[in-house]
Amino acid sequence: KRVSVKIIGESASRRLQLSRGDLDIADSLPVDQLSALKQEGKVAVAEYPSLRVTYLYLNNSKAPLNQVDLRRAISWATDYQGMVKGILSGNGKQMRGPIPEGMWGFDATAMQYSFDEAKAKAALEKVKDKPASLTFLYSDNDPNWEPIALSTQASLGKIGINVKLEKLANATMRDRVGKGDYDIAIGNWSPDFADPYMFMNYWFESDKKGLPGNRSFYENKEVDSLLQAALKTTDQAERTKDYQQAQK
């Protein structure tokens, strides 16, 4: 059979054409539109666990986010549960460490940030070079990215960090992220195969900085050693130990 792929920028247009029967499959619809499609009863809306994640890049390679206490302040100020409930209508779960739940190597005891304004302000007090503002890059590639950007802007505003939102064409955003020309940016990630390598090595190895995966430009020699050790054995228990140690 002949397969035709259409590029339709507006999610509302994708949803309308799907409802009318003009499309057989539509991708990247907001959760509220999925709920409306369910109620219409014309389209099958399937729900299943996913290893797809959405995360923010905090640029470790340049000021001011090369300061760990500033990154901690942002992490404590983020309203994770508010995003899950308000933006995703509960159809998601906050990550606990880089390896998603459901994949071997997941650490149920890994440290997890939560929204805590007091801890965010305490971390910010330790920052020597406090930023006048930070820029948040996003595109219309995912309809959830803009509300996540707005939520982040509001949350950080409460602790005195001004966030400027910059919406770009997705290709332009990727180019900026690849060059490290940003403060905060957003992205989605789905593994090519179900192995922690796709999250740990891609995201954190020093030699994968930029678009290859380490888009936060993180660098840590001890972490590099543990990640490389995890690739030198086929023993899953040993690999799990290395990956979990790298997260500490």
Language-model regions, residue ranges each:
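Short, hydrophobic alpha-helical packing/hinge segments within bilobed ligand-binding/sensory domains
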Residues: 14-15, 23, 34, 70, ...
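Extracytoplasmic/peripheral linker and loop segments enriched in polar/acidic and small residues
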Residues: 158, 162-173, 201-248
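Ligand-binding "clamshell"
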Residues: 35-47, 179-182, 195-212
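Well-structured core secondary-structure elements of compact alpha/beta domains
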Residues: 2, 7, 49-63, 138-140, ...
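Beta->alpha turn/N-cap motifs
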Residues: 11, 27-33, 51, 80, ...
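Ligand-site clamp/hinge motif
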Residues: 1-36, 153, 162-164
